[in-house]
A protein has these predicted regions:
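Short, acidic, small-residue-rich periplasmic hinge/interaction motif at the N-terminus
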Residues: 3-53, 84-85, 122, 286
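N-terminal periplasmic accessory domains that precede
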Residues: 10-13, 60, 78, 103-106, ...
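Short acidic/polar hinge/loop motifs at secondary-structure boundaries
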Residues: 51, 94-121
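Extracytoplasmic beta-strand/coil segments of soluble accessory domains associated
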Residues: 55-56, 61-96, 114
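Transmembrane beta-barrel wall of Gram-negative outer-membrane proteins
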Residues: 154-184, 195-236, 271-292, 346-347
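Membrane-embedded beta-barrel scaffold of Gram-negative outer-membrane proteins
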Residues: 292-298, 304-306, 441, 449, ...
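Gram-negative outer-membrane beta-barrel transporters
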Residues: 407-409, 512-516, 535-632, 707
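C-terminal beta-signal and adjacent terminal beta-strands/loops
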Residues: 624-631, 655-710
Length: 710
């Protein structure tokens, strides 16, 4: 063990024996300050994830909620810095394309993470497409000697979650890692009802992760990666729904389907299936001591199929005078692409990065919509109609960038970059985006940065709305039939921030940011399907400030927390008219615009972890949310108010039992989520943009977990 104090240590030489590996672990009370970055950076280690309540059984969104400016918006979506999703996932530096369900199913389980480096805003030129935040995950890989574990977690909400992982080597040059996890619960999708009773909410999901690394020689390394996620979700329902309050629907349905008898509202049977696969191969090559590059090729398939229960759903139509329908949806997309990253260390003053990425996406969006004809007076009539549409699109995206990190001296760093983005999908668009960042190290304990950059964010091709469906003359006809193509968002981004090492055991960071957009992109849930549809405002603004504190009070006591304030407003509707009601469109087009659905004014989280006698860990977690936007009543302006705030407290205790066999141990954990059983809605369907449904948070829940390490 080598301890480094105030005095520089003498040189250390590590010598590898011919047949044994040396494991080198660098331990610091806190992560060092990033004094050359022009953005807010945050890091999560494997140990920090395992210390959370539920440990590494947490899902992606649960882990993300521990970083600054992260807002939870239901359906496993996390909105960072007041952007709707707009999160870029990377595995070992390679961007992972979104799924058709917009990250509704986790692409990669936190169980496979070794660490995650997070960049919030202030992106250098090599980061594009999704730019609110970048989550760069370094995954586990094989080691010698090999390692593995078998884990079982279960508890409230009919939850059962077995998992298995194993990593090792084959020969001297090939390493591998395998993970499989299966999850079953009755809260796969947040229900519209408060409390423990969940109606029609069962879900199952299976995830597989396979990684292989081949070290050809000292200059060439190859990595293969394969991800698979298969899931089925029942759509939760509410009891006590009023059957055919208008008296018009049931006679029409029974006239179209003689003998039809509607079920109770909680028995309406809608569900969604998801099927996602992703694979890539990366070649990393060291040309010499100053030149490095990586070349990657990737392929992704993603599919989500939503099946409605048309007759029973339509039987509970509240007001046939408003547009109504029930619909099946089938979204399917294939993406292939290549990415090239080049790094050149010109000198101690200049670190140059350049590269390109080419992407091709083919998407299919099939819709089968059920409704009735319009009698000309706004009333349904005739037999039940079945309307079909089959949209097929091919889109291309090209990205190019060059970046110079210029450090003329030890105090100043200038990050100067330029990137170009071109897309061809429903329309052809492009932008050249300068990125300029400056970092100033006042002293080793205090660093300040400023940033300005242009951002270009095209919508996901596979999530564009089904525009070809002809509903004219039916009760599904929208109140506004305007059909503009969604434009790519173009934004000016400003950021200023600072990092402070208060002492060896505490770091503090502050960041303020402002984003001014043309064609501010957004997405919403329209109807009961969890599949989201994109729309855009003519312009928008987002702003906020956040602060984060990390503490290592003793060797066994750590804490971290953050608080953020933010705002998002949209003005004028650019696209998506046929998805919205006339009142919503009028509110958006009003002089003052509207607050965005995903906006949350105040957000905060905190975690305290204490390790007792090396083997027992206690963890407490707090999550505070001031509430997503809604309106007080149907006459109030859209999103003019917010849902009630809520604060969630989670607790965890975990103990490690050593086993008599070499290198083996057993972990036993007990977790409580929502300790004080607060009843709250994550969002409320009424008063916000779209025909959304409410989503209620998890009540007090108990979980047990056991993990055998071998």
């Amino acid at each position: 063990i080598l301890k480094v104090g105030a005095t520089p240590p003498p040189p250390v030489t590590l010598t590898l024996s011919p047949t044994r590996e040396i494991s080198l672990e660098v331990v610091s009370p806190l992560a060092p300050i990033q004094y050359k970055a022009s953005s807010e950076t945050y890091a999560l280690s494997r140990k920090e994830i395992e210390a959370l309540p539920r440990g590494n059984n947490n899902e992606l969104h649960d882990v993300l909620l521990t970083i600054p400016s992260a807002v939870y918006g239901s359906l496993k979506q996390v909105h960072i810095r007041q952007d709707h999703a707009n999160l870029q996932l990377r595995i070992d530096g390679v961007p992972i394309p979104d799924t058709v369900s917009s990250t509704f199913s986790d692409v990669i389980s936190p169980r496979a993470w070794e660490r995650a480096d997070i960049i919030l805003g202030g992106m250098e030129a090599q980061y594009g497409n999704k730019a609110a935040a970048v989550l760069d995950i370094t995954t586990k890989s094989g080691t010698k000697p090999s390692f593995g574990s078998v884990q079982m977690m279960g508890g409230s909400n009919k939850t059962i979650n077995p998992s298995f992982e194993y990593g090792g080597t084959i020969g001297e040059k090939f390493r591998f890692y395998i993970l499989n996890s299966h999850t079953a619960t009755n809260r796969g999708i947040e229900p519209p009802t408060l409390g423990r009773s969940v109606y029609h909410g069962q879900s199952e999901r299976n995830q597989t992760f396979i990684r292989g690394d081949y070290q050809h020689d000292n200059r060439n390394n190859f990595t293969w990666l394969f991800l698979n996620s298969v899931a089925k979700y029942q759509i939760p329902t509410s009891p006590g729904g009023e059957l055919d309050p208008s008296g018009q629907m049931l006679p029409l349905l029974q006239g179209s389907r003689p003998g039809f008898s509607p079920v109770a509202s909680q028995a309406i049977d809608e569900f969604q299936k998801e099927n996602n696969q992703y694979g890539h191969m990366v070649w990393r090559h060291d040309v010499n001591a100053n030149n490095f590059f990586s070349l990657s090729g990737y392929m992704r398939h993603t599919r989500a199929t939503f099946k409605t229960d048309p007759l029973n759903l339509l039987a509970y139509t509240a007001d046939p005078a408003e547009p109504f329908s029930a619909a099946d949806q089938d979204r399917n997309a294939y993406s292939t692409g290549v990415r090239f990253d080049y790094t050149y260390t010109h000198s101690k003053q200049h670190l140059i990065k350049a590269g390109f990425q080419l992407d091709r996406t083919q998407s299919v969006n099939k819709t089968r919509l059920f409704t009735f004809a319009d009698d000309g007076g706004g009333n349904p009539t005739g037999d039940l109609l079945s309307l079909n549409a089959d949209n097929r699109q091919i889109g291309y995206r090209q990205e190019f960038w060059i970046q110079d990190q210029w450090s003329p001296n030890d105090q100043w760093t200038f990050n100067l970059g330029l990137r170009g983005d071109i897309v061809q999908y429903q329309r052809n668009e492009g932008q050249v985006s300068p990125r300029i960042g400056v970092s100033y190290k006042y002293n080793p304990s205090n660093v300040f940065h400023v940033f300005y950059g242009r951002m270009f964010t095209p919508p996901n091709l596979e999530a564009l709305s089904f525009a070809k469906l002809n509903t004219l003359g039916t009760r599904a006809q929208p109140e506004d039939v305007t059909n503009n193509s969604v434009r790519a968002e173009r934004a000016h981004y400003f950021e200023v921030g600072s990092y402070h090492a208060l002492n060896r055991y505490a770091t503090l960071q502050f960041t303020g940011w402002y984003k001014l957009s043309n064609f501010l992109s957004d997405a919403g849930q329209f109807g009961t399907t969890p599949l989201l549809n994109y729309f855009a405002f003519e312009r928008g603004s987002q702003r906020g400030i956040d602060g984060a504190l990390k503490l290592q009070l003793t060797e066994n006591l750590t804490a971290r927390g953050n608080v953020a304030w933010g705002q998002c407003k949209g003005y004028g509707l650019q696209s998506g008219h046929f998805l919205l009601e006339a009142k919503e469109i009028a509110d958006i087009n009003s002089q003052g615009g509207v607050f965005c659905d995903h906006m949350q004014t105040l957000t905060s989280s905190a975690i305290v972890s204490y390790r007792l006698l090396e083997r027992t860990t206690f963890t407490g977690q707090m999550l505070f949310a001031s509430g997503l936007r809604t309106s007080e009543n149907e006459d109030a302006k859209t999103n003019s108010s917010h849902s009630p705030s809520y604060t969630i407290y989670n607790l965890s205790i975990a103990h490690v039992f050593p086993l008599p066999w070499e290198g083996q141990k057993f972990l036993l954990g007990f977790d409580i989520v929502n300790l004080f059983d607060q009843r709250y809605y994550i969002n409320q369907g009424e008063g916000s943009i779209g025909l959304g449904v409410s989503h209620a948070g998890m009540p007090r829940s108990f979980f047990f977990r056991g993990q055998w390490f071998f």
